[in-house]
A protein has these predicted regions:
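CN hydrolase (nitrilase-like) catalytic-core segments centered on the catalytic cysteine
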Residues: 88-108, 177-271
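Cys-nucleophile CN-hydrolase/nitrilase-fold catalytic domain and related Cys-dependent amidase chemistry
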Residues: 44, 49, 53-129, 135, ...
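Hydrophobic residues at beta-strand termini and immediately following loops
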Residues: 35, 84, 136, 161, ...
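Boundary at the C-terminal end of the N-terminal hydrophobic targeting segment
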Residues: 24-28
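Active-site catalytic loop in hydrolytic enzyme cores
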Residues: 98, 114-192, 196-197, 202-219, ...
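Bacterial N-terminal signal peptides
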Residues: 10-21
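N-terminal secretory signal peptides that target proteins for export/translocation
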Residues: 1-7
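Short beta-strand segments enriched in small/hydrophobic residues
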Residues: 29-39
Length: 283
């Protein structure tokens, strides 16, 4: 028995050691603040104040990442943005970068971008040091809602960035309607997707319209196999054929299996902080 023990146990220990050293997905958590803010069309300074108030709350709750809605600076489908939007990098994105550095938070936010004579519905990801990590230009721009419409981005802007929290991607609202774009995201194997939304409908359609957003976020989380944070706003559309439609909040967070982790308030502002499970596999 002793001879068997001395011969077999070392081999067993070596085998166990090899097994435990095999490559495996690393499990971690990231603390995300979902910043469902009020956005008023054209109110750049007021919107920046509301962004900073949300960041203060996120910082107090020790968040790692703060997420914001689509067109958080000037409002979505606002034709005045053709004159007042800034380039990226530029004054607006620089202010976001300064806030990220001030509060020590990574920020994902939607903001309009002027590039020459074109206006883009864009979103940026900025790290806690204020470095611009990525810019995405919306592809599914709904051109019937503004004249002239937003310019369409390139599909190559759908990408992921390696960060301290894993591979993070950003797309915008109606981009998630497209199976083609969703499949491209899936091929990139993200660890976390952050999606600014401008989810608007007529007053009589709320709160039922929240369920549509929930179903959309859940369906994409299942395809992407990672947590998805869909951040909506509160407010009202004031231009174009959808004038008077309400942004009703109801931001949605789902895990990589499509389980709903949070739905934010109906037609009210809220900053909610959640610990999201991130499974960082070998890519």
């Amino acid at each position: 028995m002793n001879q068997f023990h001395t011969r077999v146990c070392p081999r067993l220990l070596i085998s166990l050691s090899l097994l435990t050293s095999l490559p495996a997905a690393a499990c971690a958590k990231v603390r995300v603040a979902v910043c469902q803010i009020l956005v008023i069309d054209g109110d750049r300074e007021g919107n920046f104040r509301r962004i900073e108030y949300a960041l203060q709350t996120a910082g107090e709750k020790h968040a790692d990442i703060a997420t914001f809605p689509e067109s958080s600076i000037l409002g979505w489908e606002n034709p005045d943005a053709h004159k007042s939007a800034a380039p990226i990098p530029g004054p607006d994105s620089d202010r976001i970068a300064a806030l990220a550095k001030q509060y020590g938070l990574m920020i994902a936010i939607g903001l309009d971008e002027k590039d020459g004579d074109k206006l883009y519905d864009s979103a940026i990801l900025v790290d806690k040091h204020g470095k611009l990590l990525w810019k995405h230009r919306k592809l599914n721009v709904l051109p019937e809602l503004m004249d002239p419409p937003y310019a369409k981005g390139d599909v190559e802007s759908i990408n992921v960035v390696d960060t301290e929290f894993g591979r993070i991607g950003v797309v915008i609202c109606a981009d998630t309607f497209s199976d083609e774009y969703a499949n491209r995201v899936a091929s990139l194997k993200p660890d976390l997707m952050l999606v600014p939304y401008g989810w608007a409908e007529t007053v009589d359609k709320w709160p039922a319209h929240e369920r549509d957003l929930e179903q959309l976020v859940v369906s994409r989380a299942k395809i992407w196999k990672c947590p998805v944070v869909g951040t909506d706003l509160v407010g009202e559309m004031t231009h174009g054929p959808w004038t008077g439609r309400t942004y009703g909040g109801g931001s949605v967070v789902a895990d990589g299996s499509g389980n709903v982790l949070a739905i934010l308030r109906d037609r009210d502002t809220e900053v909610r902080v959640l610990d999201l499970p991130i499974r960082r596999a070998k890519h």
